[in-house]
């Protein structure tokens, strides 16, 4: 394989000649330090290479070494609980090797530890017919994750050999498959190119909600397992805290958090918090189900693209094992900015605001890899990849290209409003601008498993919030006293919805996570208040009298979100009784 020669260097872009027969997206090693790069354009025998490491110090005429392989990652036991850079190099291994807190250029470290022995339990026997995606055995990687060892998608045939139960490294052959005379060894680890989606048998409609413990996300704008969501918002509106809440409390089996071009402090927060936090669904440390990919703002720009693909490929791998995985990316705007930077250096024709014309297709490729699927292989199983990505529009302008193009491909939109954030209303998700295309799909699950009136209660809350916004314009002009009594009740109910339900403290031990049952109980209190109060208003009782009769009950309902734990829901029975008693007394007064 012939090596190339550097002819031009422009930041992270290197042009090399003598690259005849090179392939698009082939990985190459650039210069004497052997920096990792990827071919993104070929013109004759010239290759345009985006380099994933700092190119300072390399010179024209230095060699470019071809590898003949696309950018691939290692998939196997040892991924959970690790923190990788954008090229899937484990940061702890780099620190041990270099004895430095900085990543040395050109360093090569195996993604999966070669020395650790894993206890393998075989699930198939010699002579079995094997095809890609079959589970041939399991490794208990963490107390939370049973790592299912899969046959690589391109392998099929008869199982010629399989090892006995025991301890093996990821490089030890654990099985041999006879593929029409050719022998294919299977190891605990396999490699997969990051730009190629992993195969599946069938894509299914997402019908089960991905519970997040955040009330506004679960109830007002729910996301389904296998869904796609975007969280756009200006600086300081709470994107990172919302995404961290998703990563901490979501009912996903595996969470992959990609810090793409954001501040390093945010990844440090994750590393500091996750080992001490308990997963509310299992009671185990959160790090036992989490993989972190750190590609922070001070790391090379080009590697941002790689980090997004590395994250989604790992998510697909765990999906193929039959798990529900969540990929959290913060933020895709930084990836788009990297594409713009490289497009400018390659002298491509810019589109809107300087972004490349292929930005929509790149975003579409990324979001298309989400979904709930029936996997290939035996036994039959179902898995999902849910994608939630932050978008950082400059100045909060949602019409800029990255936000507007992202909106074409996602089914859930959680827009963050800086005016809500300034009013200390968190999560600062604007309930008038947001939407979810999954409400109809997940309503049946909520009605069956949580509360048969869930859809009715949710729709009442949404209608009230929309009507309150219409009335707010009138109140600004003529004041609240001129409103009809039923409209005054709308304002009071909307205040209760916002204070008792939509506001949530991500740093409060009790309020940070609301179980579906707790959410339904709070909704039920608001629904009862609105239903009974509407009846009384129709009978001529003023809204002010109803609110005054409540005394301290409404503040008690508002405080209940941070006072009543998820396993103490019987305390809501007492609040419900008090509420009904107040209305019964008012009805007696109205009847006399």
UniProtKB/Swiss-Prot annotation:
Cellular compartments per GO CC: plasma membrane; proton-transporting two-sector ATPase complex, catalytic domain
Q: What Enzyme Commission number(s) appear in the record?
A: 7.1.2.2
Membrane topology category = Peripheral membrane protein
The record's top EC class is: translocase
A GO BP entry is: proton motive force-driven plasma membrane ATP synthesis
Protein role: Component of the A-type ATP synthase that produces ATP from ADP in the presence of a proton gradient across the membrane. The A chain is the catalytic subunit.
Q: Which GO terms describe its molecular function?
A: ATP binding; ATP hydrolysis activity; proton-transporting ATP synthase activity, rotational mechanism; proton-transporting ATPase activity, rotational mechanism
Q: Which SMART domains match?
A: AAA
**Keyword Heme part of the UniProt annotation:** no
Q: Which family does it belong to?
A: Belongs to the ATPase alpha/beta chains family.
Q: Which CDD domains match?
A: ATP-synt_V_A-type_alpha_C, ATP-synt_V_A-type_alpha_N, V_A-ATPase_A
Q: What is this protein called?
A: A-type ATP synthase subunit A
């Amino acid at each position: 394989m012939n090596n190339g020669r550097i002819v031009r260097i422009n930041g992270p872009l290197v042009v090399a000649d003598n690259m005849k027969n090179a392939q698009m997206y082939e990985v190459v090693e650039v210069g004497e330090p052997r920096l990792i790069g990827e071919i993104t354009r070929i013109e004759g025998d010239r290759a345009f290479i985006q380099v994933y490491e700092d190119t300072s110090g390399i010179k024209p005429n230095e060699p470019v070494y071809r590898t003949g392989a696309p950018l691939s990652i290692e998939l196997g036991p040892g991924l959970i609980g690790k923190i990788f850079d954008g090229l899937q190099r484990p940061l702890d291994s780099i620190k041990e090797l270099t004895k430095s807190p900085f990543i040395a250029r050109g360093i090569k470290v195996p993604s999966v530890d070669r020395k650790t022995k894993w206890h393998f339990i075989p699930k198939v026997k010699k002579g079995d017919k094997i095809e890609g995606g079959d589970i041939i055995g399991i490794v208990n990687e963490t107390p939370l994750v049973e790592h299912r060892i899969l046959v690589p998608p391109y392998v099929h045939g008869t199982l010629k050999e399989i090892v006995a139960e025991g301890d093996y490294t990821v490089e030890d052959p654990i099985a041999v498959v006879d593929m029409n005379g050719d022998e294919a060894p299977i190891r605990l680890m396999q490699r997969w190119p990051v730009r190629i989606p992993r195969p599946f048998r069938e894509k299914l409609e997402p019908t089960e909600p991905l519970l997040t413990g955040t009330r506004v996300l679960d109830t007002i704008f729910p996301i389904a397992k296998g869904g796609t969501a975007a969280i756009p918002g200006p600086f300081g509106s709470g994107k990172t805290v919302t995404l961290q809440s998703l990563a901490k409390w979501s009912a996903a089996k595996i969470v992959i958090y990609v810090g793409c071009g954001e501040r390093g402090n945010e990844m440090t927060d994750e590393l500091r918090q996750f080992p001490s936090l308990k997963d509310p669904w299992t009671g185990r440390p959160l790090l036992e189900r989490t993989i972190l990919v750190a590609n922070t703002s001070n790391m090379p720009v080009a590697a941002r693209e790689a980090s997004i693909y590395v994250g989604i490929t790992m998510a697909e791998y765990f999906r193929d094992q039959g798990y529900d995985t969540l990929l959290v990316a913060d933020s895709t705007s930084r990836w788009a900015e990297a594409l713009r930077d490289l497009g400018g250096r390659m002298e491509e024709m810019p589109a809107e605001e300087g972004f490349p014309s292929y930005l929509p297709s790149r975003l579409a490729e990324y979001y298309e890899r989400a979904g709930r699927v029936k996997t290939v292989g035996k036994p039959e199983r179902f898995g999902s990849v849910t994608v939630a990505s932050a978008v950082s529009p400059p100045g909060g302008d949602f019409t800029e290209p990255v936000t507007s193009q992202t909106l074409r491909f996602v089914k859930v939109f959680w827009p963050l409003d800086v005016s809500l954030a300034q009013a200390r209303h968190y999560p600062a998700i604007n309930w008038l601008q947001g939407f979810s295309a999954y409400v109809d799909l997940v309503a049946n699950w909520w009605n069956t498993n949580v509360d048969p009136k869930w859809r009715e209660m949710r729709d009442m809350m949404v209608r009230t919030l929309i009507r309150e916004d219409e009335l707010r314009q009138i109140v600004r002009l003529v004041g609240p006293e001129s409103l009809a009594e039923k409209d005054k009740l709308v304002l009071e109910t909307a205040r209760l919805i916002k204070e008792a339900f939509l506001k949530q403290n991500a740093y409060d031990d009790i309020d940070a996570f609301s179980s579906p049952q707790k959410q339904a109980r709070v909704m039920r209190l608001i629904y009862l208040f609105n239903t009974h109060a509407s009846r009384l208003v129709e009978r001529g009782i003023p809204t002010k009298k109803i609110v005054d009769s409540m005394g301290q009950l409404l503040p008690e309902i508002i405080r209940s979100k941070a006072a009543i734990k998820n396993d103490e829901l019987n305390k809501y029975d007492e609040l419900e009784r008090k509420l009904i008693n107040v209305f019964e007394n008012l009805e007696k007064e109205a009847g006399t």
